[in-house]
Amino acid sequence: DEVGNGNPHGPQDTHNFTLLLQELRSQLDAQGSADRKHYLLTADTPSGPEKVSHIEVGPVSRIVDWMNVMTFDFNGPWETTGPTESQSNLFPDPFDPAPRPTRSKPYPDNGEISVAEVVANYLAHGASPRKIAISIPF
């Protein structure tokens, strides 16, 4: 069911995304050479490790000007275990009433997700620290 799965993908799409960005970068650079401009290429990228694993983080960070890492919506009304917590907490909250064990790796044992853990995961996957922009809720 493609509609219910968010953004369905096949195994080839991880590399295809990198190839798409590389082609866009090449075309933008060619146009920039012609009109003496630099055209920005950015990508909004996910926080969850299960989603990050579908991106070639190191190669993508070398292609784009920066990645807008979507470090928000960590908690919300969809949770059934109680009150919602921070939308975009900087560090893990040991008192989070709704730990998510499915997210326990590479995040702490209680499954709590945080901006610090997301950024550390991107760095571990080869992202350039200069290419990470964190997106926060407003």
Regions found by a protein language model. Name each.
Residues E2-F138:
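Substrate-binding surface in catalytic domains of secreted glycosidases
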